[in-house]
């Protein structure tokens, strides 16, 4: 798709470059195009077209093409003049961008003049710069036909046409050319002159211009297509000039309505005649997207996820390297010196700008095609560099340049790389300006005399065959050798130093003596002995010149003025020449190779955009050096860009970062978040209700395009549009479920107005598929009623687990292990075939498996896992930045404590005392009234107690009471009772406090001792477990030691020493003994390898289990019981251990259970079933509730914890009773069967005892883990249940005389401050602003008197 926005340069501010006329031109008419009130209505096919050569019957299909946007406006570009033309008519907005194309709705103005029907409308012009270097398409009505031409017109500066019906005082003038312009297309088309409206559909795609037309019906039909190879950037409608006629008779009006096209997807409906009867623009509305998604013009009721109408980029970021020079490719291509195919030339262009449209205009192009590259993508793209090769084309060899050809031009001159992204340009230059440069590029050809060709100016040299030689090649024979030749004596000469003479042999036949036989006869092309000829025929490679032409060595020797080796011109073979001239022009081939597409600074500037500011934090369209997309730019600090790099990619090739050369800032590019849009559509409604999931309406309104709706609100699911918020209303059935218990309900318009008078038929309501009370009234169990236990309380447990994930690698030199360095053993071992190779192969596989296993474990640990090197099971410590304090909550006596303010601490004396449970209750009882002291006596374990601290008031009161009782006995004896009770109760309070403290001390001592014992046992078990881990490591070494010990085993031979065997026995017997030893050692080695295979299987399984536990236990919380520890998983920690991983799991285990009645499901009203979701239905007090499976927590049954069933039936499957056959077959007696085969045969079996010490050690940490578990239980049981002794703070008020002293001191302070301010000069300025509140004695009596007089 072409998206071309072409900005005319200031030097081309007018249309065309030739003033056809200067008369009656002004700039007074400031008319602007009218905007239509009607919009593009595609429902009847307006704006669509019939695809070329395709017929569809009775079908609905999606089609992507160039269409107008549904609902877009038209612009009227028709202009009508009489005498004057306005210069403003030839500038924007009348001069418009063509971009992808336009759709035109043209009024056919019909007028009868002198009984003659005239059909008139304006002429449209589509082109680029409108001069004779580019093609311009003109569509002009003329006498009832359409004249359509595509020529290289020289357009007038102010072009116009004239009326045919009324005439015009102006002459039609819109182009002027000194000769007939070059045209690609000229054709006349008829049209219906009686039609009221004509419709035109013009668009361009990949350099091809398409035209469609209709005068009856809305969809247009194919008119013509034309390959231009260039981009059409602008169009305008030429003014139509007519003679001025009075307005009452002038009923000729012009209307030329135009709307732009873009690449869009349409849903088209074809009837039984293949006619388009309905169409939908898929991206014009939410409803249209649903229609296209379902490929139906009447979608069914449902909820649809939409992808369109989401992201609305608010800006465009465009970047190119500024101030780069022009590549000037056209200057190099038009150079008059043109090379031949033999010495083709190459030029590399980089860090520059080029304009492909201009290039193709400035070069006389015959054809331009591309390979592995869409040539439309070149416009506006950037590359690392552009490599351009060129040479003149021999006329007879033009076909050799077809891609994949094996003709002479590509096999022996220039090879076209069909795997690269390239374009092939065929062009020509005028004959008078061309000089063909024929030059031999071969260095070894030129060494021996051939560097240029003596041909005419337009003859082009090319190679038929190419040859390569060694650097020491010389075509001349050695004179000292050939001087003895009697016949066939070749020419000879002295070869250059460092080269080899031509190979010649002296031969004698029956008739001739000393006959010379030399290489490469008769010539290198048709030599008899190609293997001995040093000139090798080759095919040129990509980017290579021909290495050299062939040399007839019989014509190389001493020449005139050349004493050294020299070849005559006719000695060089395998080349031809032909003319490049055709129609007085020389044909040239050029190959453009585009390197690094969208990754460099060699850019096409056809689009002529300017660099823009970078908008951050919002969704934008971007074009970064040819790479386009949408994203959100966020400025970051990055130091990983080199000076020549500016784009950052991810592993999938997507651009994720950008360095701006203009500002030297770096950005990360994030995808535009659009959210998920769900459309709830009710069949036959005019529009759907929309839910932008997880987005606020404020974000939707500001960043996402949508059709304006008066109803929108934020919900739990996201922003809801075109619906009314009625979540307080619930429905039991729903066709438009939105999830999470919400529903979109649709009410018919008539009933809606009667009930609520709202304008939206959609309501956002709560979905409740059943009523809980109804369920309890009519419920029946499904599958029966069962009794199970569900946990109610838990305790935390710890569990340590070691998993072996690797082992030491082992490699064995099998031959050395069996035979050491004895040759006889090695010879005999070779007869065992590939046994040793198999052993090494198996061990290599074991080592590879260890590497893979370690890599898998490392990858699992590297992603989000913190390995600890100092783990501790004590929860009060931190493990590598893992702080458990926030998980433990508040610990100690300060939890929940409150304190008074700083002022209260200043004004009162604070006293703290221990509280075993009665001080706070006493304080609450008194409420601050000290007279209620004895009324608030507390009881502690049956003993009356009071707090042991008294205030000054209480001491005074009780002292007075005791004094009165002592002064007037017995009448005042009763006054001493309160004093006695007060003393006794407070002594009781001290006693019980000391008793509790004593008991707590004993509990602390016992629990601490028990905790120390448990900790000791736990560390002992951990130490034992680590010792077993160490034993696993030692076991591998022990296995190797056992294997080495087998070297000293005789395995039935007379000795384990090969030297002793050889010295004691003869050759044959020695071989037998060595063979026994080899068999034994190979058997031991085979056993060891088998053990290694068995061990690696266990290690691999352990590694897989470790990876699974890292992923499920360490990185997340496992739902499986007893998988991560014992019980329900809480968290797990992992640390490295020798050849494995050590896990520490924390879990909670049930300590108490509740027995309940459960049912697998419930049946509602006999026809509808529900099943629990991750829990149980329990029967509690004749009512059904739901609880989770891992913890007893009853809650009401709702749609969030149930799964619905279609019926209440239960399908039972009976397991078949199948037993494995464990009977033992009845075999014949072994001795009897053996005797049948070995009658009268006696043999003594050798003693092949094999003392195997290879043992596979498995970890058995069961006992240690049990000890650790018991220690943990012991620690849990050692919890110190102390009697709670609180700390109570009591504030004692000061006596009255202290307060009196404070007040007196404060008054004295104020008086001193007052006299300081009034009696010194320090406060005069302040008091003058207070209107003389204090009189001053001196200097201002007049003012005082005057003020008194005024009063």
From Swiss-Prot:
Gene Ontology CC terms, in alphabetical order: host cell endoplasmic reticulum-Golgi intermediate compartment membrane; host cell plasma membrane; membrane; viral envelope; virion membrane
UniProt keyword Cell membrane present: no
TM spans (from-to): 1296-1316
Positions of the UniProt region annotated as Heptad repeat 1: 1001-1051
Site feature (Cleavage) residues: 756-757, 900-901
Gene: S
Extracellular side stretches: 13-1295
Location of this chain's protein in the cell: Virion membrane; Host endoplasmic reticulum-Golgi intermediate compartment membrane; Host cell membrane
Glycosylation site list: 19, 29, 58, 114, 132, 171, 188, 192, 251, 335, 355, 433, 454, 561, 664, 684, 703, 725, 771, 776, 793, 924, 1181, 1211, 1221, 1226, 1240, 1247, 1255, 1276
Protein's name in the database: Spike glycoprotein
Bilayer topology term: Single-pass type I membrane protein
Annotated stretches, region: Fusion peptide 1: 901-922
Ranges where the BetaCoV S1-NTD domain occurs: 14-294
Major subcellular site: virion
Keyword annotations of the record: Coiled coil, Disulfide bond, Fusion of virus membrane with host endosomal membrane, Fusion of virus membrane with host membrane, Glycoprotein, Host cell membrane, Host membrane, Host-virus interaction, Lipoprotein, Membrane, Palmitate, Signal, Transmembrane, Transmembrane helix, Viral attachment to host cell, Viral envelope protein, Viral penetration into host cytoplasm, Virion, Virulence, Virus entry into host cell
Family membership noted in the UniProt record: Belongs to the betacoronaviruses spike protein family.
Organism: Human coronavirus HKU1 (isolate N5)
Annotated region described as Fusion peptide 2, given as residue ranges: 920-940
Domain notes: Fusion peptide 1 (FP1) and fusion peptide 2 (FP2) function cooperatively and have a membrane-ordering effect on lipid headgroups and shallow hydrophobic regions of target bilayers. They are considered as two domains of an extended, bipartite FP. The membrane-ordering activity is calcium-dependent and also dependent on correct folding, which is maintained by an internal disulfide bond in FP2.
Taxonomic path: Viruses, Riboviria, Orthornavirae, Pisuviricota, Pisoniviricetes
Subunit details: Homotrimer; each monomer consists of a S1 and a S2 subunit. The resulting peplomers protrude from the virus surface as spikes.
């Amino acid at each position: 798709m072409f998206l071309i926005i072409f900005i005319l340069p200031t030097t081309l501010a007018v249309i065309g470059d030739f003033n056809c006329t200067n008369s009656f031109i002004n700039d007074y008419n400031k008319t602007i195009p009218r905007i239509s009130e009607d919009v593009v209505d595609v429902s009847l096919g307006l704006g669509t077209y019939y695809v070329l050569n395709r017929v569809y019957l009775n079908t609905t299909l999606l089609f992507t093409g160039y269409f107008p946007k549904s609902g877009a406006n038209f612009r009227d570009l028709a202009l009508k003049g009489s005498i004057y033309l306005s210069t403003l008519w030839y500038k924007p907005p009348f001069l418009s961008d063509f971009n992808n194309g336009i759709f035109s709705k043209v009024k056919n103005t019909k007028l009868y003049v002198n009984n003659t029907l005239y059909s008139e409308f304006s002429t449209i012009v589509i082109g680029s710069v409108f001069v004779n270097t580019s093609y311009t398409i003109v569509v002009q009505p003329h006498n009832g036909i359409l004249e359509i031409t595509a020529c290289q017109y020289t357009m007038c500066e102010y072009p116009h046409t004239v009326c045919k019906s009324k005439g015009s005082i102006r002459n039609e003038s819109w182009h002027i050319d000194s000769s007939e312009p070059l045209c690609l297309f000229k054709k006349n088309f008829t049209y219906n002159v009686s039609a009221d409206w004509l419709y035109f559909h013009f668009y361009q795609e990949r350099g091809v211009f398409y035209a469609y037309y209709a005068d009856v019906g809305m969809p247009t039909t194919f008119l013509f297509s034309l390959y231009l190879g260039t981009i059409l950037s602008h169009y305008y409608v030429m003014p139509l000039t007519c003679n001025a006629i009075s307005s009452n008779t002038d009923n000729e009006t012009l209307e030329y309505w135009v709307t732009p096209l873009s690449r869009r997807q349409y849903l088209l409906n074809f009837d039984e005649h293949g006619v388009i009867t309905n169409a939908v623009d898929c991206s014009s509305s939410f409803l249209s997207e649903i229609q296209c998604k379902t490929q139906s013009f009447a979608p069914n009721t449902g909820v649809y996820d939409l992808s369109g109408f989401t992201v609305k980029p608010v800006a465009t970021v465009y970047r190119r390297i500024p101030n780069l020079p022009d590549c000037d490719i056209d200057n190099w291509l038009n150079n008059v010196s043109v090379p031949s195919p033999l010495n083709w030339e190459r030029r590399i262009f980089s860090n520059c700008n080029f304009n492909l449209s201009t290039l193709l205009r400035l070069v006389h192009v015959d054809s331009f095609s591309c390979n592995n590259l869409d040539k439309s993508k070149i416009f506006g793209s950037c590359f690392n560099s552009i490599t351009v090769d060129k040479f003149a084309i021999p006329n007879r060899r033009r076909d050799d340049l077809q891609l994949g050809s094996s003709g002479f031009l590509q096999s022996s001159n220039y090879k076209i790389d069909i795997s690269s992204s390239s374009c092939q340009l065929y062009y020509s230059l005028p004959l008078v300006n061309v000089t063909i440069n024929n030059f031999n590029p071969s260095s070894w050809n030129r060494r021996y005399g051939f560097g240029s060709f003596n041909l005419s100016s337009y003859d082009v040299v090319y190679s038929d065959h190419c040859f390569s030689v060694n650097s020491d090649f010389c075509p001349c024979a050695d004179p000292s050798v050939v001087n003895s030749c009697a016949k066939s004596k070749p020419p000879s000469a002295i070869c250059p130093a460092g080269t080899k003479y031509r190979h010649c042999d002296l031969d004698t036949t029956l008739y001739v003596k000393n006959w010379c036989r030399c290489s490469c006869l008769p010539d290198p092309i048709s030599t008899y002995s190609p293997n001995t000829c040093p000139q090798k025929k080759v095919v040129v490679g990509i980017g290579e010149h021909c290495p050299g032409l062939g040399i007839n060595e019989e014509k190389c020797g001493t020449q005139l003025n050349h004493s050294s080796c020299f070849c005559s011109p006719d000695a060089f073979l395998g080349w031809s020449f032909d003319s490049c001239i055709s129609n007085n022009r020389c044909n040239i081939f050029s190959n453009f190779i585009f390197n690094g597409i969208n990754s460099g600074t060699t850019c096409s500037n056809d689009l002529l955009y300017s660099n823009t500011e970078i908008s951050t934090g919002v969704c934008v369209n971007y074009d970064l050096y040819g790479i386009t997309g949408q994203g959100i730019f966020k400025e970051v600090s990055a130091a990983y860009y080199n000076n020549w790099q500016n784009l950052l990619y991810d592993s999938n090739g997507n651009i994720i970062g950008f360095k701006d050369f203009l500002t030297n800032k770096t950005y990360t590019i994030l995808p535009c978040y659009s959210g998920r849009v769900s459309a709830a559509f009710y069949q036959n409604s005019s529009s759907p209700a929309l839910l932008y999931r997880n987005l606020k309406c404020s974000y939707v309104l500001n960043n996402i395009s949508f059709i304006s709706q008066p109803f929108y609100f934020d919900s739990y699911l996201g922003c809801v549009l075109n619906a009314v918020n009625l979540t307080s209303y619930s429905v039991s059935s729903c066709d438009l479920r939105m999830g999470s218990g919400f529903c979109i309900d649709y009410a018919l318009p008539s009933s809606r107005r009667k009930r609520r008078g709202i304008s939206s038929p959609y309501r956002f309501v709560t979905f409740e598929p059943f009523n809980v009370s109804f369920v309890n009234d009519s419920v029946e169990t499904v599958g029966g009623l069962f009794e199970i236990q569900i946990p109610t309380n838990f305790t935390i447990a710890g569990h340590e687990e070691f998993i072996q994930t690797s082992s030491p690698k082992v490699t064995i030199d099998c031959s050395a292990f069996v035979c050491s360095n004895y040759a006889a053993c090695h010879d005999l071992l070779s007869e065992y075939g590939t046994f040793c190779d198999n052993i090494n192969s198996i061990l290599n596989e074991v080592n590879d498996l260890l590497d893979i296993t370690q890599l898998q474990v490392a990858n699992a640990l590297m992603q989000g896992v913190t390995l600890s090197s100092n783990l501790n099971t004590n929860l009060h410590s931190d493990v590598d930045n893992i702080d458990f304090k926030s998980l433990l909550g508040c610990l100690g006596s300060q939890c929940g404590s409150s304190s008074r303010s700083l002022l209260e601490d200043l004004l009162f004396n604070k006293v703290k005392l221990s509280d075993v449970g009665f001080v706070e209750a006493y304080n609450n009882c008194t409420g601050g009234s000290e007279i209620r002291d004895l009324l608030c006596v507390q009881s502690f374990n049956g003993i009356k107690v009071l707090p042991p601290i008294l205030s000054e008031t209480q001491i005074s009161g009780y002292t007075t009471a005791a004094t009165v009782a002592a002064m007037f006995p017995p009448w005042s004896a009763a006054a001493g009772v309160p004093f006695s009770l007060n003393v006794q109760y407070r002594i009781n309070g001290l006693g019980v406090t000391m008793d509790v403290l004593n008991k707590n001390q004993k509990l602390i001592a016992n629990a601490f001792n028990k905790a120390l014992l448990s900790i000791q046992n736990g560390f002992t078990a951990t130490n034992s477990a680590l010792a077993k881990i160490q034993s696993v490591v030692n076991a591998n070494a022990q296995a190797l030691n056992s294997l080495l010990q087998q070297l000293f085993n005789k395995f039935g031979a007379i000795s384990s020493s090969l030297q002793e065997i050889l010295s004691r026995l003869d050759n044959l017997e020695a071989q037998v003994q060595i063979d026994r030893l080899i068999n034994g050692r190979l058997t031991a080695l085979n056993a060891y390898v088998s053990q290694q295979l068995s061990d690696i299987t266990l290690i691999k399984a352990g590694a897989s289990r470790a990876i699974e536990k890292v992923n499920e236990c360490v990185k997340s919380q496992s739902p499986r019981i007893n998988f991560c520890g014992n019980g329900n998983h809480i968290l797990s920690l992992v640390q490295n251990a020798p050849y494995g991983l050590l896990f520490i799991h924390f879990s909670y285990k049930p300590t108490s259970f509740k027995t309940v009645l459960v049912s697998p499901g419930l049946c509602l009203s006999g026809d509808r079933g529900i099943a629990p979701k991750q829990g149980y239905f329990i029967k509690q007090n004749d009512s059904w509730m739901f609880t989770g499976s891992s913890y007893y927590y009853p809650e009401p049954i709702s749609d969030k914890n149930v799964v619905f069933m279609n019926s209440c039936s239960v399908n039972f499957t009976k397991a078949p009773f199948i037993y494995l056959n464990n009977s033992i077959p009845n075999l014949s007696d072994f001795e009897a069967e053996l005797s049948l085969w070995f009658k009268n045969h006696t043999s003594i079996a050798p003693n092949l005892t094999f003392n195997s010490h290879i043992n596979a050690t498995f970890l058995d940490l069961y006992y240690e883990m049990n000890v650790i578990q018991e220690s943990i239980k012991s620690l849990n049981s050692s919890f110190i249940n102390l009697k709670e002794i609180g700390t109570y703070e009591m504030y004692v008020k000061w006596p009255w005389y202290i307060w009196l002293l404070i007040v007196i001191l404060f008054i004295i302070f104020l008086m001193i401050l007052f006299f300081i301010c009034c009696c010194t000069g320090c406060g005069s300025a302040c008091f003058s602003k207070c209107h003389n509140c204090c009189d001053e004695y001196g200097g201002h009596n007049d003012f005082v008197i005057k003020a008194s007089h005024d009063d």
